[in-house]
Each structure stands twice: as structure tokens, then as C-alpha cells.
Amino acid sequence: MILPTIAIIGRPNVGKSTLVNRLCQSNDAIVFDKPGVTRDRTYQNASWGGKEFQIVDTGGLVFDDESEFLPEIRTQVFLALEEASLALLVVDGNQGVTDGDLSIAKWLRNSSCKTIVAVNKCESTTLGISLASEFWKLGLGEPNPVSAIHGSGTGDLLDLVIGELPENNIQDDEEKIMMSIIGRPNVGKSSLLNSICGEKRAIVSDISGTTTDSIDTLIKKGDNNWKIIDTAGIRRKKNVKYGTEFFGINRAFKSIDRSDVCVLVIDAVDGVTDQDQKLAGRIEEQGRACIIVVNKWDLIEKNSSTIYQVEKELRSKLYFLHWSKMIFISALTGQRVDNIFEHALNAVNQHRRRVTTSVVNEVLKESISWKSPPTKRSGKQGRLYYGTQVKNKPPTFTLFVNDPKLFGITYRRYIEKQIRVNLGFEGTPLILLWRGKQQRALNKEVERENIELIQKD
């Protein structure tokens, strides 16, 4: 479904993100009492009166000021208006009409986009009508008093909004693959997003922390629809102060949790840091498919063996993700960027894959023939009766054995490796659940499922 888009526009700190959260009935937009919290444009879906649409939140718009990030924020606002079906100009009722409001209103009047004025911070209905009346001078029609914090007036505002929107262009509601771009600050995540999209979708700067929110971007590659999430850079907890970065990092962790596949971006120049290792552990812990993207490869002096040496060194430190594909790219030049989708799609497919019990047991039987389960000093030997896949996302296998304690970590890793070697599963973690059960307790189950035991007591 292609949804009509509403662009939320206004000066810094007039309550745009709070209003977005109110209209979308969510807390996805970061709200903090400080100008410049929202920089890139961020999207959320909403519905009202049986009509669905998406709202794009933008940074505070300031003309004639070239201070840090303001030119880039302007570019993001301009792009948001280009794709919008409707603009919602948010102003501060308590402050009244400012020169900034007049400049934005003039720009909107010269655009071809229909605009509705929302006068925010009108907590009292009676007083709100009085405060809103001043904004007739913007020349954009009737101003509408609302309170983003308390919700008053937002229902009437939404009634106006859906009345101005075009009918939804309904297409096949195709599944979207959720891909999050994860990494430390300044490893090139936003540059990678821009390279993938072929436009300046996110603000890029050498200053750490430019991205403070998680940015969702829809893109179609081949037959697949992707939702790409660019996340805030994640630093050590002790270096993170309460505020926008704190909220952004929480959003980034949530992005991992809701992803089908994570793209962990590593800086080729800096190599793997402690924080990279923690992020790798988080991805593995959440059971997400993953590919490792080594960015800034264009900055490395190379010979014929460099890539192999670097990969070996990186993998030795990213042992949590030993199963992930590693590719070397340059977001700046676009080198190998398109390969990301191929490997990410393969990782997603492997993450969702199911294997029949008969195939699983063929692999286990062959694995045992090459290397028998260990025998304890007491003379008791491990017996592996059979295995079956019990779920996917990530692929999870239950292995029924006589006593899990007889199977040490070395042999468990061997079995996992054999499953990967014989069945694939590149790009996804595997979970092996070792369950102790007496053979006689399994007899009815294996007879019912027509399973042949690999080993018997």
C-alpha cells in the first residue's frame, strides 16, 4: 500500500515531534526540550477515520542561518515537502507569530503543497482560540489550536487532515524485510544509507552523534521491499549522557529487536573495538540474522593478501558472529554497496529456513560416524538419539540425548559446525537445545513420527 504522506514542518522546538507521537499514538519520535533533536526526516504510519497515511517528522527549519547542521536540516525538510501530499505547519501559540514562522509560511505559500496550520501549546480551549487567531497573518488559512501534550484539538485536526488527503493507492500489501544499520558513531552508517538510496536521505557529518533517531527508509530491490533503519551510533554507557543520545541508543537497540537482518558496520581504519564486540554480542543474543560490513575500505593500502589478513583479524575479535558473511565496501565511492542486499537476503532466507527431521538426522548420523560422542572417565558415553528443528527465526534444533552433561562444549560446537557445513545457514545464528531423555520414553514418539533413532542404548 502506497500511503499519502503528511510533512510536519516548523521552527525548532515548537513541539513537532510531540505532535507526531500524539497523532501516531506512539513514542517513536524522540522528544527532548532542546532545539535540534530531530535532524533527519523520520516516518511513522498513522490512521484516522478509516484512512491510513504516513507522517514524516522533520528537523527545525531555520532560513538564513548556516550554523552547524541547519543547512542539512533544510535539505531534509525540502525533500520531505517534495514527497508530501499535505504539509502541517506547527507553530507555538505561547510565543505568537515570529519572523521564523513568517519565513516558513512564505516558503509554503510558494509551494504547490496544501498546508494546514496547527497552533501548538494551546492547553486551554478558550485561550487557544484567542492565541490561534494571531496566526491568520501567516496567510495559510484558518489556524487550528491544539495541545500535543494533552491531546486537545488533535481529533479535529486529524479530521481536517484526512479531508485533504488523496485516496490511498492500494497495491499488493507485500511483505517488507526489516534491515537495521548498526554501528558505533561515525563508522559511516548514514553515508551507507545515502549510498543505498541514491539520495541524501540522512545527514552526514564527521561529528559523532549526527543521527539521533532511528530513520526508516523504504526501498525496492528486485522483487523485494526493504525497510532500512539507520540507527544512532552506540557508545559505551559511561559516555552517554541522559538526553537525545540516550533515547537514540534505546531506539537503536529496539531496532535490532525488530529487524529481520542487521548490518553491523565496522570502520576498516579503526578495526574492531570493545563496543563493536558488544554490539555483535547483542545481535547474537537477540537471535538476528546479520552481515558484517567493513566500511571505508577505500582508505586502506592494499596488496593481494590484505583482504584475507584483515578478515582473519576482524573475525578473531567478532567471534560472536562467526557465522556472518563479511563484505568490504566504501559507502563514499559505492564500492560493493549493492552486494549488501544479495547477502542480506540470503541471511534472511537462512534465518527463516526449515529443514525436515529426516534431513537433520542424516546430517547428525554422518557427523557421529566421523566423530563419536565423548566418553567420560566413568565409562559412560553420550548417546544422540535424534534431532529435529522446532522453530525458525532463528533456526532452533532440539537434540534428544541420554544425558546432556555428557556432551561438552567442544562436541556441541562440532555438531553445530556440521549442521552449518552440510545444510548452510550462513548469516544466521543457530540454537541447539540438548534434551536428556531415556530411550524407552522416546519409543512412542519416534514410532508416531516414523523416526529412526541414530543411536540406541
From Swiss-Prot:
One of its GO terms (biological process) is ribosome biogenesis. Residues 4-169, 177-352 form the EngA-type G domain. It holds the Pfam family MMR_HSR1. InterPro entries: G_ENGA, GTP-bd, GTPase_Der, KH_dom-like, KH_dom-like_a/b, P-loop_NTPase, Small_GTP-bd. GTP 1 binds at residues 10-17, 57-61, 120-123. Residues 353-438 form the KH-like domain. Keywords: GTP-binding, Nucleotide-binding, Repeat, Ribosome biogenesis. GTPase that plays an essential role in the late steps of ribosome biogenesis. Belongs to the TRAFAC class TrmE-Era-EngA-EngB-Septin-like GTPase superfamily. EngA (Der) GTPase family. PANTHER family: GTPASE DER. HAMAP family: GTPase_Der. Associates with the 50S ribosomal subunit. This is GTPase Der. It comes from Prochlorococcus marinus (strain AS9601). The gene is der.
